């Protein structure tokens, strides 16, 4: 038995849309009854003046390039923010690293979360507190299925950004965000 999917081909041919892919229910996979996430409930205080939350994920970027000389705008932005520098990546690859960033777990649990529909606690809590969540991807978030695993409950989810080149997409993302 060798599992095979044609998701990208079907999207390219217009047979299914990215929204259809996000809503797919993979009934052929065994449901995980052992998934217990989160183990403890989140404890926090709701403030009358909630803070803005900006999470920037740059794929295949060496942290040593994060400095005033190489990335002055990002560096300047970070200087005026709270920075969390103790995060340890759960993988060297995009899929595992992003999964670990949002779930704080090893990507060995990827399939369990894909099947269960359980969303990251961060996203659940931001939605519960009525934060406006904007996802601005340069690459598609349909494959790997970040849209389904991380953001399926985010309203009006943007799964891709139009543009012929990475530069075009990055310019569009910057303009849309600002």
What are these regions (language model features)?
Residues 1-178:
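Active-site-proximal alpha/beta segments of enzymes that process anionic O-linked groups
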């Amino acid at each position: 038995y060798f599992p095979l999917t044609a998701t990208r081909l079907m999207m390219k041919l217009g047979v299914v849309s990215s929204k259809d892919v996000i809503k797919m229910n993979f009934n052929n996979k065994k449901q995980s009854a052992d998934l217990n996430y989160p183990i403890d409930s989140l404890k926090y205080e709701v403030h009358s003046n909630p803070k803005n939350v900006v999470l920037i994920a740059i794929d295949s970027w060496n942290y040593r390039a994060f400095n005033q000389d190489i990335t002055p705008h990002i560096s300047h932005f970070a200087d005026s923010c709270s920075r969390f520098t103790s995060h340890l990546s759960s993988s060297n690859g995009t899929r595992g690293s992003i999964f670990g960033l949002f779930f704080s777990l090893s990507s060995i649990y990827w399939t369990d979360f894909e099947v269960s529909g359980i969303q990251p606690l961060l996203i659940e809590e931001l939605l519960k507190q009525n934060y406006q969540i904007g996802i601005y991807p340069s690459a598609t978030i349909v494959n790997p299925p970040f849209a389904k695993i991380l953001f399926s409950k985010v309203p009006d989810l943007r799964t891709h950004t139009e543009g012929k080149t990475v530069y075009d997409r990055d310019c569009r993302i910057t303009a849309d965000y600002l």
